[in-house]
Swiss-Prot record:
Keyword DNA-binding attached: yes
Source organism superkingdom: Bacteria
GO biological process: DNA topological change; sporulation resulting in formation of a cellular spore
Protein name: Small, acid-soluble spore protein 2
């Protein structure tokens, strides 16, 4: 899979491989072939699911955190 050359920079060094693995796993679960030939809707569904899972993970890690 080609690297994304967007201006977005990852805040945690070395996390790109884990994100790519998550992307591939979700695409497989959804039956989506990622890439330029896939529809925007199909590619977007994978990106949306990644976001949902990362937010859920962050919320569970923050559970019980108070100021």
């Amino acid at each position: 899979m080609p690297n994304n050359n967007s201006s977005n920079q990852l805040l945690v060094p070395g996390v790109q491989q884990a994100l790519n693995q998550m992307k591939e796993e979700i695409a497989s679960e959804f039956g989506v072939q990622l890439g330029p030939d896939a529809s925007s809707r199909a590619n977007g569904s994978v990106g949306g699911e990644i976001t949902k899972r990362l937010v859920r993970q962050a919320q569970s890690q923050m559970n019980g955190y108070t100021k």
